[in-house]
Amino acid sequence: MKPEELEDMTTLTIKTNALDNNIRIIKRLANGAKVIAVLKGNAYGLGLTKFASFLQSKGIDNYGVTELSDAVTLRRNGITGNILLMTPLYNSEDITTAIDHDITLSITSTDCAHVIDETAAYMNHPTVHAHLCIDTGFGRYGFLCSEEKQIADTVQSLRHVRITGIFSHFHAAACRNEYYVKKQFQDFTHLCDTPVSYTHLRAHETELHL
């Protein structure tokens, strides 16, 4: 059998009734908190636009992606809820594209914040929504928990950006390191006195196991 014929035999079957049940369980565990569906990596192989449309039909209206192209694709395919780009943008052209498609941006540093603010000013855009990203141990990007003054000074300097959320990512949730996860949680909540619409930290592993 030829390799291309083997590829044609690969099929992914998704049972929507099982997905529906999983959504209900997660909503129940969230205990009234909003659920953000993170759809990176082609929705973890489930198909970005089809899966997002299914989630939207089930009342999910918050989405997280790690690629600007995915955020734009969701908008162009009828996803009307909040879309958060969870990785930083430093290029004015990319930021302009995100603003044009009503994408919520992530601010991971003072430089990142200023580029977004300057781009919005150039576009004469009154308010761009953004979430602050805090590094509680993941080590990729984000303000450190010890940088409270820098965070405050950065936020106060913004004229065209409205901070609507603050988030971080559990570093060791999957391995169930309960002590370390709780330490991350404490470090994060220490910075969450700012009144914002969304404060999000949990991943599905912590929701199910902690």
Show where each model-derived region lies.
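Glycine-rich phosphate/diphosphate-binding loops that line cofactor/substrate pockets in enzymes
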Residues: 26-32
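Conserved small/polar residues in nucleotide/adenosyl-binding loops
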Residues: 199-208
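Active-site-proximal beta-alpha core segment in soluble small-molecule metabolic enzymes
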Residues: 3-6, 10-13, 18-21, 33-198
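Generic leucine side-chain signal with a strong bias for well-ordered alpha-helical environments
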Residues: 74, 208-210
